[in-house]
Amino acid sequence: MSKLKEYRVNRQIRAKECRLIDENGQQIGIVPIEEALKIAEEKGLDLVEIAPQAKPPVCKIMDYGKFKYELKKKEREARKKQREHQIEVKDIRMKVRIDEHDLQVKLKHMREFLEEGDKVKVWLRFRGRENIYPELGKKLAERIINELSDIAEVEVQPKKEGNFMIFVLAPKRKK
């Protein structure tokens, strides 16, 4: 978790005077710190130094506990939003001579990943003599692409690399 900025509150404020803003956001003007503290105390709120670098520093009358809570809430929302937008690439590996039921299970997993917005990298593995029949891999790749064509588009075309044929599917963009 990131560290929230610490603000000086009430008696922690060291300035002699400040530019005061009330709880409604109205600027009151430049007043001595003691007077600002008195006004805040009368209203049952805190005096918070929100811009210490300004000359004179800017202080606002507010409920500091509520202010900190709102800041934490905004930070949580920002982190959540950031997490939602991360696209992962999920790997699915299978043999070229995969059984029908196993293929259906793999297709189901790929469909779930694509519906969640993730990309899917498919690795078709060739073993032994299968290497001399790359058309087996091409057929399987075409079948997978056709089965998922309603929700996915090919981002990287099927390509043979060593003992694997690799291609990447991405979720279709919403219009």
From Swiss-Prot:
Keyword Cytoplasm included in the entry's annotation: yes
Cellular component annotations (GO), alphabetically ordered: cytosol
Principal location: cytoplasm
One GO term of the biological process aspect: ribosome disassembly
Molecular function (Gene Ontology), one example: ribosome binding
Sorted UniProt keywords: Cytoplasm, Initiation factor, Protein biosynthesis
Pfam families attached to this UniProt entry: IF3_C, IF3_N
Compartments reported by the entry: Cytoplasm
UniProt key word Thylakoid: no
Transmembrane feature ranges: none
Function in brief: IF-3 binds to the 30S ribosomal subunit and shifts the equilibrium between 70S ribosomes and their 50S and 30S subunits in favor of the free subunits, thus enhancing the availability of 30S subunits on which protein synthesis initiation begins.
Protein family membership: Belongs to the IF-3 family.
Subunit structure: Monomer.
Protein name: Translation initiation factor IF-3
Organism: Aquifex aeolicus (strain VF5)
Organism lineage: Bacteria, Pseudomonadati, Aquificota, Aquificia, Aquificales
